[in-house]
């Protein structure tokens, strides 16, 4: 075998000190060179960056990555977003032209537009749905990658702007793991924000080189921003325009035809592509009148001090800002190190080298005249702004300030001031440059600084919402802002700006440190800064829960059932509707109830009728009108005090033949068919025993606990009648006897139940009037003294005219003594004054089944102690818990 030339053997000898390389060294070195070359290949290099951000995400959110099958931070909005992502996938391959006609809020149209459509969020995860992963698993994976991809987007923006890997890593870490992102974890669409930095990167790339390829990338990034989040798209419009103006000024491209022609073409095509995804929001606002009220926007608008309140998932700054007003709601603190690094950017700047100039001393006469007019406009706008703020939207001066609002006057003042400094700085401002345009073009600051400054400022102003005129003028001029409820989400742009400024600050610190201590290398400074940021942003161990990843039996049954209408699931409320939305991704049938950014009128009416009080039979008419095919009742979700109302309603509905009981699943989920819509639906088993109509007396026989809950008002009314008639608290035995007498034949939960109870209570008062003990107590008293005694028993101080009016009514025969007794017992002053005493006594009756001074107490010391506690705290739940945990109650239940 021929010997290799000496020149070719030299590298091997160099590696081994002039001796031949050992066996295996050459293949290892070649493998290393191959791996290094592969790592430099752009796709692999970018993938490695993403993987590093995935590693950081795993560390800062541990153990989230170990529970991707079913991890969610709460059972609210994550379930809603999971359904939206599933629907985007499902409808894309089933009927893409009707993407917005979702299977919720049936029978309304365009219901996907009731909230974010999240199509750009769901699109990258379509393969996971295709592989058969559960919707909640896909959501968990997307949540994890949202951190990593957002960081990667900011990394790219920082690298493109500065050409520095160190700046890029700092910017990526800040943007990926800022505490506010953890605060938004319930709303994945706002956590997933890689397109925000990427659209600004595309703008920078296109500004620097106006090629067709970069124009296409700008249009695509703009399109994906709108495709992912309508809110972020709306928020991006202003900073994109301002950053574009900054870059055009710095690069002198205002008259560059290629820039305008190609950018207009790219953005127009992107906007055209977004029309099918934006038009439904306009149609929804017109069809259903959906619009965010100003009060909603105000309630979600922060104040500057809320930037010192931190998300509680952050382990280092936990609890910071909790005590300030609104601190528990607004969590905007970006972290200490990003602020310190930003200060380094602002303060550690190279000194001015150009000589200072004052004003525009050599300006042309025409420019001086323009400046004089601008100064006059500024003075005028300032004066008008003062008046507009003071008289904002009032009728003074003929309603002038209903048109010249504070935000419009302040916007005019701001525009005039910006125009003034762009032409020339005022003489009292000493600067190296004649005007702001020259300052902007100065090489003293780079593109990254100006873009970071713009983004930080605009994002900060967004967070203030209605508390600052900037957002109000956006609300007036940009219709899309009227559909957004939470202005603080716009603060994400501030964090992107701070990420860039922090990266520049670390670079400047590295320059200063290495200049003073040459032995410290620049990469070391970047590594230390990144480690400090990761330590500050740490959220591990992250608190989360295991979500309902698999469907229950009734959901699987609905999936296999053909139906002509929709499904109503009860109880319907914000606490449960998110879960129903998640399950609708499993059965894929039309759902009438649900939750979203806006809700349907039908859903709100159903929720109103079933949330409190008697469930009216009018609900059946609504179900038939919609039409609903099936009603599912989640019995385990119904609070105990509401179960009788539900049982009564469904008993009457089944008895009337308008609902048909089909079956019970998992021992607690009942399925009913709406007979008018599904006449062929058959009953598979007999209705459960609890659907049998029962009166209040039988419920009290079963458990005295039925004195409380939804029957508390009845029990308190009987208590007050007894107190006024006898001047003392009732004893357990007599009270239960009277309650059973009242409740015999009285069916709770019906629309006529309260009227029936009132009639029975009046009959009881008339019966008492005939009793010997009543006559013995009151028979010898005249009408005036009788009325006075009733008020004395009640403990209510009635004025003389009130007592005289009631006594005169008795004397004239217009009122009976039983009627007077009822009137005093129903006095609102008695109801309020004796509320705590009555409720506490009812707890003794319901839980312990005895009077307060019966054994083992023998006196009222225990009663008086708990009464003082209740009057001090007004915490009835605490009292109920104390009775439930008492040894006496537990022994009784055994």
Describe each region flagged by the PLM:
Residues 39, 236-271, 349-360, 421, ...:
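Perimembrane helix-loop-helix junctions
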Residues 56-150, 178-193, 300-323, 466-471, ...:
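Membrane-interface coil-to-helix junctions
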Residues 75-91, 276-365, 369, 391-395, ...:
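Periplasmic/ER-lumenal interhelical loops and adjacent helix-loop junctions
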Residues 183-190, 300-303, 320-330, 394-409, ...:
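Membrane-helix boundary/interfacial segments in multi-pass membrane proteins
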Residues 531-699:
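Extracytoplasmic
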Residues 621, 689-894:
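Composition-driven recognition of low-complexity segments enriched
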């Amino acid at each position: 075998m021929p010997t290799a030339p000496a020149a070719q053997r030299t590298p091997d000898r160099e590696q081994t000190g002039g001796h031949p390389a050992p066996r295996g060294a050459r293949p290892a070195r070649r493998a290393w060179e191959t791996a290094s070359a592969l790592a430099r290949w752009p796709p692999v290099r970018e993938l490695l960056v993403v993987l590093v951000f995935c590693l950081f995400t795993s560390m800062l959110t541990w153990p989230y990555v170990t529970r991707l099958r079913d991890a969610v931070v709460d059972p609210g909005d994550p379930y809603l977003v999971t359904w939206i992502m599933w629907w985007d996938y499902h409808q894309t391959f089933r009927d893409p032209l009707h993407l917005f006609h979702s299977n919720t809020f049936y029978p309304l149209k365009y219901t996907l537009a009731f909230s974010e459509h999240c199509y750009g969020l769901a699109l990258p995860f379509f393969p996971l749905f295709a592989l058969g992963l559960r919707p909640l698993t896909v959501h968990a994976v997307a949540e994890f990658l949202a951190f990593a991809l957002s960081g990667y987007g900011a990394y790219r923006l920082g690298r493109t702007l500065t050409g520095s890997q160190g700046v890029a890593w700092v910017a990526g870490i800040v943007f990926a793991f800022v505490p506010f992102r953890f605060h938004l974890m319930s709303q994945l669409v706002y956590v997933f924000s890689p397109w925000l930095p990427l659209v600004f990167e595309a703008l920078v790339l296109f500004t620097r080189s106006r090629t067709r390829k970069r124009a296409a990338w700008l249009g695509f990034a703009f399109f994906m921003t709108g495709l992912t989040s309508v809110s972020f798209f709306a928020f991006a419009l202003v900073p994109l325009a301002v950053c574009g103006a900054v870059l055009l000024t710095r690069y002198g491209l205002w008259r560059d035809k290629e820039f305008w022609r190609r950018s207009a073409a790219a953005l127009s095509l992107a906007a055209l592509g977004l029309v099918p995804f934006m038009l439904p929001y306009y149609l929804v606002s017109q069809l259903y009148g959906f619009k965010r009220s100003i009060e909603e926007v105000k309630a979600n608008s922060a104040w500057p001090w809320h930037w010192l309140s931190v998300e509680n998932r952050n382990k280092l700054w936990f609890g910071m800002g909790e005590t300030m007003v609104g601190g528990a709601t607004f969590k905007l603190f970006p972290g200490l190190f990003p602020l310190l690094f930003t200060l380094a950017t602002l303060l550690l700047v190279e000194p001015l080298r150009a000589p200072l100039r004052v004003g525009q001393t050599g300006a042309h006469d025409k420019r001086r005249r323009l400046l004089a007019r601008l100064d006059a406009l500024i003075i005028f706008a300032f004066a008008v702004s003062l008046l507009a703020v003071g008289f904002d939207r009032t009728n003074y001066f003929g309603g002038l300030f209903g048109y010249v609002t504070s935000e419009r006057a302040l916007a005019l003042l701001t525009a005039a001031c910006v125009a003034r400094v762009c032409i020339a700085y005022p003489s009292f401002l000493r600067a190296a440059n004649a005007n702001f345009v020259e300052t902007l073009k100065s090489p003293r600051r780079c593109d990254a600084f100006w873009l970071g400054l713009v983004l930080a400022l605009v994002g900060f102003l967004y967070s203030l919402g209605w508390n600052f005129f900037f957002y109000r003028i956006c609300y007036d001029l940009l219709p899309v802002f009227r559909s957004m409820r939470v202005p603080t989400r716009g603060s994400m742009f501030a964090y992107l700006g701070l990420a860039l400024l922090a990266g520049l600050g670390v670079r400047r610190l590295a320059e200063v440190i290495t200049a003073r201590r040459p032995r410290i290398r620049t990469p070391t400074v970047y590594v230390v800064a990144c480690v400090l940021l990761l330590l500050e942003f740490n959220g591990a161990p992250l608190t989360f829960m295991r979500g309902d990843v698999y469907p229950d039996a009734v959901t699987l049954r609905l999936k296999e059932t053909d139906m002509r209408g929709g499904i109503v699931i009860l109880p319907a409320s914000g606490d449960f509707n998110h879960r129903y939305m998640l399950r609708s991704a499993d059965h894929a049938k039309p759902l009438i109830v649900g939750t979203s950014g806006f809700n349907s009128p039908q859903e709100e009416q159903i929720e109103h009728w079933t949330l409190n009080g008697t469930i009216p039979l009018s609900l059946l008419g609504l179900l038939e009108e919609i039409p609903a095919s099936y009603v599912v009742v989640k019995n385990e979700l119904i609070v105990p005090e509401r179960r009788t109302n539900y049982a009564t309603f469904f008993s009457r509905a089944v008895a009337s033949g308008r609902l048909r009981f089909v079956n019970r699943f998992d021992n607690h989920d009942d399925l009913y068919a709406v007979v008018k819509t599904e006449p062929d639906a058959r009953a598979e088993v007999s209705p459960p025993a609890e659907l049998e109509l029962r009166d209040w007396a039988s419920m009290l026989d079963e458990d005295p606990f039925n004195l409380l809950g939804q029957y508390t008002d009845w029990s308190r009314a009987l208590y007050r009648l007894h107190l006024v008639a006898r001047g003392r608290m009732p004893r357990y035995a007599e009270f239960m006897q009277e309650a059973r007498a009242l409740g015999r034949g009285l069916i709770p939960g019906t629309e006529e139940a309260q009227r029936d109870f009132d009639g029975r209570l009046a009959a009881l008062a008339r019966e008492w009037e005939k009793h010997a003990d009543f006559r013995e107590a009151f028979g010898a008293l005249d009408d005036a003294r009788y009325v006075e005694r009733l008020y004395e028993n009640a403990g209510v101080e009635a004025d003389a005219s009130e007592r005289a009016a009631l006594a005169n009514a008795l004397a004239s025969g217009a009122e009976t003594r039983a009627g007077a007794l009822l009137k005093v017992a129903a006095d609102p002053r008695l109801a309020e004054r004796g509320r705590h005493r009555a409720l506490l006594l009812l707890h003794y009756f319901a839980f312990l089944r005895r009077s307060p001074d019966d054994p083992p107490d023998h006196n009222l010391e225990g009663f008086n102690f708990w009464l003082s506690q209740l009057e001090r705290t007004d915490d009835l739940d605490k009292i109920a818990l104390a009775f439930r945990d008492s040894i006496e109650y537990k022994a009784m239940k055994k």
